[in-house]
Amino acid sequence: MRALIPESDSRPADVLVPRYTNGKDTCIDVTVINSCRLDLLLRSSEEPGYALNHVFNSKWSKHGAACERAGMVFLPLAFDTFGAIHPQGVDFIKKLGKSVARSTCQEDSECVSQLFQRLSILLVKGNVSLLLNRRPDIQVP
């Protein structure tokens, strides 16, 4: 969303949740990283979570301080193409699941579990779509 930060054209939020964190607006920047990217591959193979931390820190350095100065909370919601989620993202998803549970009169654990399952299905669908669109053309004799 543009124009969230005065005198800036940056877009720190894919999703803006009003008054979500201690009464402050929360800017959620959803990002998916491929840990097999050539510039990340070696470190990712040696250090679990390296790609997630890399993209989280990159997003934070780009938007975090500006959001704080504007009185907002910034959360880079970082996912790996293989299904890993940055620890702060896991905490956010659990909090979101508990909020849904309260509003629907369900058990917290049930809503949190369903939310993670839905995210997992979306990731698998996205990966399958990428694979199917990259398959080589088959020449029929």
Regions found by a protein language model. Give the residues of each.
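Non-catalytic C-terminal interaction segments of nucleic acid-processing enzymes
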Residues: 1-13, 21-26, 32-141
